[in-house]
Regions:
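Acidic, amphipathic alpha-helical patches
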Residues: 43-47, 69-72
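Short, glycine/charged-enriched secondary-structure capping and boundary segments
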Residues: 69-74, 96-99
C-alpha cells in the first residue's frame, strides 16, 4: 500500500527533487511517522480552534490513516470526512471524478 505502481500516473511515480533534506530533517520519512526535529510538535489540541468548515479527505492506502483522519474529524468543529477506497494521499489523481464531485458539493455548501 502506498507504493506507486508502473501503471499509476507519472505525477505519482516521479521522485521528489526539492525540499527532501529539509523535510526529512523536520519530520522524518513522512508527517505521519515523525522522527525528525518536529517529532514532538503537538497539533491535536489546536484542531478545536479551527473555525472554518473543513473537508478531510484521505485514502485507505494513505499514510494519513483512517485513525489520523478520524482524529482530525472528531476534533475540528464543522468538519466532514471522506475516505476514498484504494487510494493513497493523492485521491484527486486516483479517483478524480469522485474527488471533483465531492469538492464541488462541499464548496457549494461552504463557500
Amino acid at each position: 500500500a502506498g507504493v506507486p505502481k508502473d501503471t499509476d500516473p507519472e505525477c505519482l511515480r516521479r521522485p521528489k527533487k526539492i525540499g527532501t533534506d529539509s523535510y526529512i530533517t523536520a519530520w522524518g520519512p513522512n508527517e505521519y511517522t515523525p522522527i525528525g526535529n518536529l517529532s514532538n510538535y503537538e497539533y491535536r489540541d489546536k484542531l478545536k480552534n479551527i473555525k472554518e468548515p473543513a473537508l478531510i479527505i484521505n485514502g485507505t492506502n494513505d499514510l494519513c490513516t483512517p485513525l489520523v483522519a478520524k482524529t482530525m474529524y472528531d476534533s475540528i468543529p464543522n468538519s466532514r470526512w471522506e475516505l476514498f477506497d484504494d487510494c493513497r494521499h493523492a485521491c484527486f489523481v486516483e479517483d478524480t471524478d469522485r474527488y471533483c464531485r465531492l469538492l464541488n458539493e462541499w464548496m457549494e455548501q461552504n463557500d
